[in-house]
Amino acid sequence: MTVIFHIEGGLGKHIMATALLKVIKKHHPKDNIHVVCAYPDVFKHNTAADHVHQNGQHGAFYKQYIKGKESKTKIYFADPYTQSDFILEQKHLLSIWANQWGLKYEGETPQIYLTQSEIDYFKPFYQTDKPILAIQPNGGPQNQGFNYSWTRDIPEPVVLKVVEEFKSTHSIVHIK
């Protein structure tokens, strides 16, 4: 079976999607998984993805991977941010994302795979004995008046609680 996991959104959503890719792989362990996304480097070296394609640059994707094989193709493409459980803060976002497709989320966490040369390059910048916790509490387009979005940004009091909780055990990196 061909499995297509299509992600739209920003870098943070793509990083979060690496956890969902683990869920998809758990449900499709022997299937060929294609990730279609805006930030393909997030999925680089991720063994759960057999192929990674950048949005708008996947050419004859339909013809090559789907046409004539529709009955053996599963497509995961939906936005969890539009679900009532997310908007009303009823469940964890990854649980919502998995549940909308009937998949079971069991606490999988995001993971980025780095090569040894990438690790060696960045090592001097992050000399620490603690694990790194990268946090992107807000985002959106720069200088366009979208300074805060309740559907995207973590409220400052929550960010401060997270930082306070992890500052003694992790080196915290703020991603803008």
Per-region residue spans from a language model:
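Catalytic machinery of carbohydrate-active enzymes
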Residues: 1-176
